Design a protein with these regions (language model features):
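Short, surface-exposed recognition loops or helix-turn segments adjacent to catalytic cores
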Residues: 139-147
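Beta-rich nucleic-acid/ligand-interaction surfaces
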Residues: 147-153
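Conserved "HGTGT" condensation-loop signature of ketosynthase/thiolase-family condensing enzymes
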Residues: 1-138, 150, 158
Length: 158
């Protein structure tokens, strides 16, 4: 098997968005984290990354974060050079899935808004990246808690 190299990474996390080399935001203010019982990610300005306002408005928070990281990783690559999009998630869009199922029960399976269902599927992040850049290549999402990252790496190596 040929050697495989990770060329770029991007992340959105509580300590700041370090994928943007020239403008990292660092959230080390004690005021910000002291009033919350949990850590909260320092999210980038999505307008700079996802230009389409309608698309951005319809995305859930987790989908925006995933798409932003994916687009940062792709950088200036042309869509023709991309051989595939492989995403991995531990729990996927669990909040959106819960929202959709609660709406399903509350409305007795009638008059459902399709947006929560569309956003609840685990392949939404990879699909949005492909749609934004018109990529018609291999697209796979792995969802299996701790094994999803390893599975995605093995898939990329094959």
């Amino acid at each position: 098997m040929q050697p495989v190299y990770i060329q770029r990474i991007a992340s959105i996390h509580p300590q700041g968005n370090h994928s943007q080399e020239n403008n990292p935001k660092v959230n080390d203010s004690p005021d910000v984290s002291a009033n919350r019982p949990f850590l909260q990610a320092c999210e980038p300005d999505y307008k700079d990354i996802i230009a389409n306002a309608t698309l951005r408005r319809r995305m859930s928070r987790i989908v925006k974060m995933g798409v932003a990281c994916g687009l940062e990783c792709m950088g200036e690559l042309s869509p023709e050079k991309i051989e595939g999009i492989i995403t991995a998630t531990g729990l996927g869009c669990l909040v959106d899935t819960e929202k959709f199922l609660n709406n399903l029960l509350d409305n007795e399976e009638r008059m459902l808004n399709p947006t929560p269902f569309i956003q609840s599927t685990f392949n939404t992040i990879g699909a949005q990246i492909a749609l934004i850049h018109q990529i018609h290549a291999y697209n796979m999402t792995y969802v299996h808690r701790g094994l999803s990252f390893e599975s995605a790496l093995l898939d990329a190596m094959m």
